Amino acid sequence: MKRSSNLLILTASLIAKDAIRYTPAGLPVIHCQLHHDGELSEAKQIRQVRMNVEAVAVGDIHQELLTMDLGAVAVFEGFLTQKTLRNERLVFHITKITSNE
């Protein structure tokens, strides 16, 4: 398997989360929406960045997402991949959550 870099670190607020579901293999899954609002530097200019991100927590990490209140801000780490083989829309797969309080 070829290894490559695909790491996203995003400070965001949790704005929506679905109920727990389970994969056919029995892994817990929670789909959620994150909102990022901040300023970044691009080409020596300050750029306002606002976006909503579709995200999913699979496996043990779902416990942390489950206990988070809507509106809570955290640092989310994970990777991007397409939603399904046929749907190329990107989804953020969360692998780590660090409280931002």
Predicted features along the sequence, with ranges:
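Single-stranded nucleic acid-binding surfaces, predominantly the OB-fold ssDNA-binding core
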Residues: 1-101
